[in-house]
């Protein structure tokens, strides 16, 4: 068994990158590691928007050598990433549910700038949504959204995602 564990350990300790600074994670507050990975997903898959449930991001990214083990601590769940064309009105519902909701970890996203009052009731929180290209979110337009299977299956109450058949 020892050769098997050595092989597994060597894979987990494989260096993937070098990070110059710590990227912190607060599941209910600011998540620099969440922001970073949402930007990676959005840009890497040429999506308009990246969304991820905050509860799926579990750790901080250390400075220095970044290993497979580090990434597995951050993303410990066996998630699959999908893209879907999502109607603007559905995306707005997802954002309303994901910001300021005390029952779930804060929604992580990239490609959007949101003006909202999280003290208001769900459905009344968001006053404006601007995409990274400067355009305003249009309810009738479809956007390429990248997210994980948990969100696209309606997990954490993200029922507007569930309609997209992932």
Region spans (language model):
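Binuclear metal-dependent phosphoesterase catalytic core
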Residues: 1-19, 113-130
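Acidic/histidine-rich, surface-exposed loop or edge segments in extracytoplasmic proteins
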Residues: 12-24, 73, 158-164
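Phosphate-interacting basic helix/loop segments used at nucleotide- and nucleic-acid interfaces
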Residues: 25-26, 35
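Feature captures C-terminal
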Residues: 31, 35-166
